[in-house]
């Protein structure tokens, strides 16, 4: 997912693609919050009413409504990862923890890395480097971590501020730390 802004929030989110809507009305029927309506542009959601229960997305065969993220436990994520264990074993690959920004979810990522390592799956930490140095060191020093990817958007502070909105200073400090 590579530092996608829609994955930074710690909650489920719903994406609307009105052009995919076939007008079946199923989403309106199953929405107990009465947050979905149809207009000239297709389906739309009143975000102030939506509870993000995902009942509408579960029944949307046209993918006009779909979850962009959902809350999962370490066990649920690991169950998905383990489906590809044979591939990892044959290629030397493993789990890549990213985000949003992995440092924003360091405690969860650490628990996932540990659980994967206990099952013989190595991990790679993929980060923009913008986060806690302590969290970064904690993650990359775990026994299951074999690789670290740093996605540095720009090394010039002015350019970084223009495109990312923050100074590159903390990012470069974290790179030097490793």
Regions found by a protein language model. Name each.
Residues 16-18, 45-46, 98-99, 127:
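Thr-Gly-centered strand-to-loop micro-motif
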Residues 49, 70-76:
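FAD-binding FR-type
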Residues 75-178:
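Conserved AdoMet/S-adenosylmethionine-binding subsite of the radical SAM
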Residues 21-24:
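Mature, well-folded catalytic/scaffold domains that follow N-terminal targeting or propeptide regions
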Residues 11-12, 68, 84, 159:
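Glycine-rich, flexible loop/turn motifs
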Residues 13, 19, 42, 66-69, ...:
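Pocket-edge positions in alpha/beta enzyme catalytic cores
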């Amino acid at each position: 997912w590579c530092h996608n802004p829609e994955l930074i929030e710690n909650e489920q989110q719903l994406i609307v693609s009105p052009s995919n809507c076939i007008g079946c009305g199923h989403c309106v029927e199953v929405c107990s919050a009465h947050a979905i309506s149809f207009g000239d542009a297709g389906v739309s959601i009143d975000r102030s009413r939506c509870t993000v229960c995902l009942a509408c997305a579960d029944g949307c065969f046209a993918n006009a409504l779909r979850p962009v993220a959902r809350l999962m436990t370490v066990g649920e994520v690991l169950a998905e990862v383990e489906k590809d264990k044979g591939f990892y074993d044959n290629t030397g690959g493993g789990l890549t923890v990213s985000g949003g920004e992995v440092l924003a979810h360091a405690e969860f990522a650490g628990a996932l890395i540990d659980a994967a390592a206990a099952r013989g799956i190595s991990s790679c930490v993929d980060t923009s480097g913008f986060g806690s140095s302590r969290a970064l060191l904690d993650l990359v020093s775990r026994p299951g971590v074999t690789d670290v990817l740093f996605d540095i958007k720009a090394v010039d502070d002015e350019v970084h501020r223009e495109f990312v909105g923050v100074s590159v200073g903390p990012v470069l400090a974290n790179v030097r730390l490793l």
